[in-house]
């Protein structure tokens, strides 16, 4: 309508901000939903997901329910998330271990920009479609061992890229490796658990 509107937004989150837990995702998903509702817009889930993404890339994944895939269409430039299975498709639980509430020394956006300086980034990006297909298949088939392999591989590749960037980034805390080793030990004992 060309009309300028103003809003005051107050947001709280019970997760540490700037600690690598995508706290901006829930905030911008909520803002996209509240803003579009306040304007009386009837956006589809895809449109709402695309809108949320303008605030934070990860926010688009917080719009659809259940198990979600984030897709970018290279032809149209559209970037949105959609559900590949409902939340009750597979009973999994996330356990978030907060090793530090401190802000990361280098934020996620700066970290993403430095990823291109890593000699490993090209291989990671080239392999992404394969890992996505493995992850999607593992979820749809409820294959936990396949999900473990692809989840841990993707996490390790991401951290390898960060560690080999210029300047190098170490987001792991002193307890990170100890936790990974504990997960490996639990896996050996037969516990269905993974890390990322």
Placement of each model-derived feature along the sequence:
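Gly/Ser-rich oxyanion-binding loop with an adjacent helix/lid
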Residues: 4-91
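C-terminal nucleotide
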Residues: 86-196
